[in-house]
Amino acid sequence: MATYAIGDVQGCYDELQGLLRRFSYDKSSDRLWFVGDLVNRGPKSLEVLRFVRDLGERAVVVLGNHDLHLVAQHEGFERPHAGDTFIDVLDAADARELVAWLRTRPMTHAEGSFAMVHAGLLPQWSIAKAVELGREVEQALAGPGYRDFLKNMYGSKPERWDDALAGWDRLRVVVNAMTRMRFCDREGRMDLEGKGTQPRKGYLRWYETRPQDQIGRASCRERVCNDV
């Protein structure tokens, strides 16, 4: 049995199937970890969602920003963006079922010596703390008040983590770090405007702020997988 971690699929169903054939994926025994953003940009988001959902326990999916964008748009809290390509999902007969499945995926996944998140983790968070905070968001997304959460999810403030944060501010920081962040400073102040590969002055790539035993070195005890 093998476990494969796969970055942003983003609606590229044919390419995903080609990748699985390339490493002789055995759906009866192998497991797939998906590092968020199953949908959008590519032409076949609907096929991707159905395929991954039907894998059941053989697939682990963490949420990315495009996944949350689809959920928010389905529920009427976000307008379509010019580049959105998941209209096939919104128009599908099983749209409600698929979106309900998607919004109940975790924010993080930790197993053995590995952890997975879509974007990044703030320097103040251990992996255990990140999993705990991710569960707070998961409970809000899966609970009866999930529409209130979606209504308050968007925004770039607060910019940094504080243990005293509460309510929507607390959850928003967690969502932004785990699904949007590329860069932050050593105090955990996020730069959510930076879209390139190089951080602006005063910021670092998020993983450069973390202990070296948590960013994928061969000898580490804890490793973080993300889509970078």
Q: Which role does the model predict for each range below?
A:
Residues M1-L55, L68:
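N-terminal active-site segment of His-dependent metallophosphoesterases
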Residues G7, G36, L63-G64, V117, ...:
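Single, functionally critical "micro-switch" positions that shape active/binding sites
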Residues W33, W101, W125, R205-W206, ...:
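Tryptophan-centered motif/residue detector
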Residues A218, E222-V228:
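Single conserved hydrophobic/aromatic residue that forms the stacking wall/gate
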Residues A2, L98, G112-A115, V174, ...:
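A generic secondary-structure signal marking the coil-to-beta-strand transition
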Residues T104-H109, E138-S219:
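His/acidic metal-ligating clusters that form di-metal
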Residues L46-V48, D54-D169:
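Active-site neighborhood of divalent metal-dependent phosphoester bond hydrolases
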